[in-house]
Amino acid sequence: NSGCNGGNRLLTWQYYQKSGIVSDSCYPYTAGKGNVEACRTACVSGEAWKKYKATNVKTLSNPTQIKNALMEGGPIHTGFTVYDDFMEYSGGIYEYVSGSSLGGHAVVIVGWGVEAGTSYWIVQNSWGPEWGENGYFIIKEGECSFDTYAVTGNPVV
């Protein structure tokens, strides 16, 4: 919604529901250094510009709701507060230890688990496969406001 200045997960999903979005092969995500290119109106792949919409968009505000939604429909869109120490993550269950807040960051929850009595989320990041654990990380349940405002919906194909 606001480019490099952040956005709102629910508004993003409501746009997806009302206006639709194109496929990743049509308009692939490109990581950058904060420069936002003009929006395209044609697919880079040469395929037809077809928009897909979503239904049943809803917010989830606790771990039980998120786990149920994962089992019912797949990945969940969420965000959390990123701190300095998260930038050094390379594996294991992340727990905030120290550092300043760097702002919010949107990610996708793909699963959960428990290790030595600690509940955690398995998460796909958008920083590429060289970061974290092949582009994924594990974060302690409840850490950094992680599971208090997630959004899900069902794609219409």
Regions from the PLM with identified roles:
Residues N1-V157:
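Catalytic-core signature of thiol
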